[in-house]
Amino acid sequence: MVLLGVGCGRQHEIIGSREVSVAYLWGLAHEGSTQIKEDLVLRGYVTLNDVLGESSRSFVVSDESGGLEVKLDAANIFTFLPLGSEVAIHCSGLYIGREGGTLALGLRPTSVYAVDRIPLEQMLNYIVVGEYVSDCLQPTLIAIGDMDYDDMFRYVMVEDVWLVEEERGLLWCDVDATTGEYISSVRHFTDGRDTLAIVTAPTAIYAGWKVPHYRARCIGVVDIDKNMVALRLSNHQITPMEE
């Protein structure tokens, strides 16, 4: 097997393996867990990690067909899997599982979860990281009304949205009245027609920041919260629309 460094417009050369897309792996997955026995390789870009606490012990890899979550038993994943880095995942021996409408890749499950996390010491058995962080990773522009369950973990951009009036002044995360700790919370943005739910993990470093109320451009991955389609910001990419 030969693996070459990757930059914009360049790819790993993989010999003896069949390259597949995220959509192909979605097609393999059934409710619960499915072992991957073929010599398959998934190539994509890291579109969500723990650099700002937006995920924990996992990262999202996306390609043009969609995205999936890779379960990894490690902290500070961003130090070796930075946003935009290209990865080649050798899937043989891994398990793919559906979890609440999303797709996860990991090891054989030993508990109630669809897959177990890959131990850090085993990561290099499955995951090869390209030499370069891509400067050509671009989200897919999508309208709120077009976002649905088929877009799970797709890396997307929503433009010209603003926080609904009744949520102005709120923080990204609510505080639990009993423990005083932040809890996973949803804030709602609108484009004047449809409403976008943005879900924030309590581990995000901006959990205690006020949600901006300017007309914004939001970039992240499509996720599910309480069985509803939502957006999870990637690297807190919410910026004002240019005048």
Predicted stretch roles:
Residues 1-7:
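Sec-dependent bacterial lipoprotein signal peptides
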Residues 8-243:
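OB-fold nucleic-acid-binding modules
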